[in-house]
From Swiss-Prot:
GO process annotations (BP): monoatomic ion transport; protein insertion into mitochondrial inner membrane
Annotated region (Contains beta strands), positions in chain: 1-65
GO molecular function, a single term: porin activity
Pfam family, one: Tim17
Entry GO CC: chloroplast; chloroplast outer membrane; cytosol; mitochondrial outer membrane; mitochondrion; plastid outer membrane; pore complex; TIM22 mitochondrial import inner membrane insertion complex
Gene name in the database record: OEP163
Deletion consequences: Lethal when homozygous.
Modified residues (N-acetylmethionine): 1
Stated name of the protein: Outer envelope pore protein 16-3, chloroplastic/mitochondrial
Keyword Ion transport assigned: yes
Amino acid sequence: MDPAEMRYLEEEDGPLMKTIKGSITGFGAGTIYGTILATWKDVPRVERNVALPGLIRTLKMMGTHGLTFAAIGGVYIGVEQLVQNFRSKRDFYNGAIGGFVAGASVLGYRARSIPTAIAAGATLAVTSALIDSGGQTTRVDNGREYYPYTVEKRAEADS
């Protein structure tokens, strides 16, 4: 294995922390998505003994979509990290496997349909593989380090 690739595999975040971050990010994205969907729907009629029915419906949609996206993000990152550590390689196959498992398990379980599970898994796998295969060229180490400050003195600062 290439030393640069080994350095990339030895990040400060472990697989568990990456999985937690993926779940939290998915929950945030799903909550925002649920909020947007709730604004497009009609507000229900005022019901007896229900205070603020529009707010309750919005919060339910936010929670439902947030938890679904959190599960997809957590399963995707978890399986990707598991496959990456098992294979000791970092390529687009890891993301494709993670995408298929996440789509098939979470969305297939939610729809309770095997054809839907296979279609969702294949869609997420292809999407992940396309994104990963296109983005691998930007991670080449060119040896330059960029600092948020200058390391060279300016001539004006000396006088």
